Amino acid sequence: FPILNKEYTGLRNKLDWIKEMQANAALTVHHNIEEYSEYTGIPFHRIMWSANQKVFKDYGEGYTSDLFFSGVTRPEQTENLRERVLSEMSRLSDYKLEINARSHRNNYAGTIYSDEDYAKKLASSKICFITTGPSDLVGTRYFEVMSGNKSLILCNRMNEVVYGDMLIDGYNCVMFSTVDEFFDKAEYYLNNEEERMKIVNTAHTVFKDRLTWLNRSKEIKSIIEGYRE
């Protein structure tokens, strides 16, 4: 049961390797499981990340920033959406922002947080700006924010194929399609605390109920056991 990883680089070689080993099945966090299955002739199953609840939690401290972003910007990623949003952050000049962006513009310089420091950043920010990664991968940050139960996920809008039932706009996150919509929604939820926290709390409940590492391990176990029957 090989696990396909970093699907955005050397994908064809990785799929060929899985095809040659004639595995019973393969696992991946990417949503293109039908395409991978068709190419290799091997069943692919989608699994997913989670978060360490002992680290990504409510630390019992107040908020120190209104909006937080930490990550790399890549021109080829989601039509350079991160860079396009970050370049207009002056539109939120009345709010306290904490931005740790690394890109080709600054030779990818920036702070690399420890897990605990990073978790505390999430727990002290009212909104966390997140987008899908290379090849539209759903990364760990979505689950880390939900686990923390303090910050609102403000993320790029993707279809159900990508997000599945893990992320639902207006329910456990807030989605945007354009730069203008990002800023409209950021301001709205920074000025409507009750509505912001309603979504934050729902996200935490969803996480605890079905997105923890225990849930993930049970899902993987079930997949493997299905091939032993």
Regions found by a protein language model. Name each.
Residues F182:
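Catalytic phosphate/metal-binding cores of nucleic-acid and nucleotide-processing enzymes, i.e., regions
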Residues P2-F143, S147, S151-D165, W213-L214, ...:
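Nucleotide-sugar donor-binding catalytic core of glycosyltransferases
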Residues C173-V179, Y188-E193:
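Conserved acidic donor-binding segment of nucleotide-sugar-dependent glycosyltransferases
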Residues D169-G170:
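Glycine-centered loop/turn motifs
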